[in-house]
Amino acid sequence: MAMISYSTIVVALLASFMICSVSANFQRDVEITWGDGRGQITNNGDLLTLSLDKASGSGFQSKNEYLFGKIDMQIKLVAGNSAGTVTAYYLKSPGSTWDEIDFEFLGNLSGDPYTLHTNVFTQGKGDREQQFKLWFDPTSDFHTYSILWNPQRIIFSVDGTPIREFKNMESQGTLFPKNQPMRMYSSLWNAEEWATRGGLVKTDWSKAPFTASYRGFNEEACVVINGQSSCPNVSGQGSTGSWLSQELDSTGQEQMRWVQNNYMIYNYCTDAKRFPQGLPRECLAA
């Protein structure tokens, strides 16, 4: 039998500890932060539900902070007349110059599709919205929504299909979130002033409580504890197939084009009226 050197074992062990890869348990890995009992964890930590009524919504956050990672969550959205409601799932750092990577699901009248709203904030500045309709009913079953965030890019995916990529273009003067650790947050709340048809359709409280369900939370990430990352000296040069160096291959690019050609309903990069002084630099570079 071939001998394995001590140094090889040590390197393998160190590599295994560098990156946290966990199929999370809600009881162990998140905390419900608001809602006065409207957030519930059941099934031995495998299922979490958030509810919204006229008095309050609810929300939770990860216990871990991340500086780069791939975060997956399976969500079943509010069914029926969800107009006025927003289910948000995002990464965010604290403070007034925060970074943020957003999925927001804007409810609608029964039979009308949800709007999936995405955005990227760097140092407190957003205005990078792209919106989509989904090609399935997100209320009839769970679907996986993923954020891949590495030093070179952010990729938003739905059931493994990439829908948006935001590249690191710092060399061209565009800010990119890379220095501030972020937690995962999710919430269900009332946004009837703007969420559905620009606020024209209000929340029908006779349909309350509204409920969103979560399972399959997975974090494969560089976890930050007491200011120290579990992935020291991250440069984006991960092992082959690692999310740390992942980029879209030709198949992924084709899938993203299909989604954007058929299901994108708003793109800030084509909204010249919104930016009379000129489109953002990342739009011109793309």
UniProtKB/Swiss-Prot annotation:
Catalyzes xyloglucan endohydrolysis (XEH) and/or endotransglycosylation (XET). Cleaves and religates xyloglucan polymers, an essential constituent of the primary cell wall, and thereby participates in cell wall construction of growing tissues. Its EC number is 2.4.1.207. It comes from Arabidopsis thaliana. Contains at least one intrachain disulfide bond essential for its enzymatic activity. Disulfide bonds join 222-231, 269-283. Transmembrane segments: none annotated. CDD domains: GH16_XET (cd02176). It holds the Pfam family Glyco_hydro_16. The active site is at 100 (nucleophile), 104 (proton donor). Glycans are attached at residues 108, 233. One of its GO terms (biological process) is xyloglucan metabolic process. Induction: By auxin and brassinolide. Up-regulated by abscisic acid (ABA). It catalyses: breaks a beta-(1->4) bond in the backbone of a xyloglucan and transfers the xyloglucanyl segment on to O-4 of the non-reducing terminal glucose residue of an acceptor, which can be a xyloglucan or an oligosaccharide of xyloglucan. SUPFAM superfamilies: Concanavalin A-like lectins/glucanases (SSF49899). Residues 25-214 form the GH16 domain. This is Probable xyloglucan endotransglucosylase/hydrolase protein 23. Keywords: Apoplast, Cell wall, Cell wall biogenesis/degradation, Disulfide bond, Glycoprotein, Glycosidase, Hydrolase, Secreted, Signal, Transferase. Belongs to the glycosyl hydrolase 16 family. XTH group 2 subfamily. One of its GO terms (molecular function) is hydrolase activity, hydrolyzing O-glycosyl compounds. Xyloglucan binds at residues 104, 117-119, 127-129, 193-194, 198, 274. It is an enzyme of class 2 (transferase). GO terms for cellular component: apoplast; Golgi apparatus. The gene is XTH23. The keyword Transferase applies. PROSITE patterns: GH16_1, GH16_2. The record marks 102 as: Important for catalytic activity. Coiled coil: none annotated.
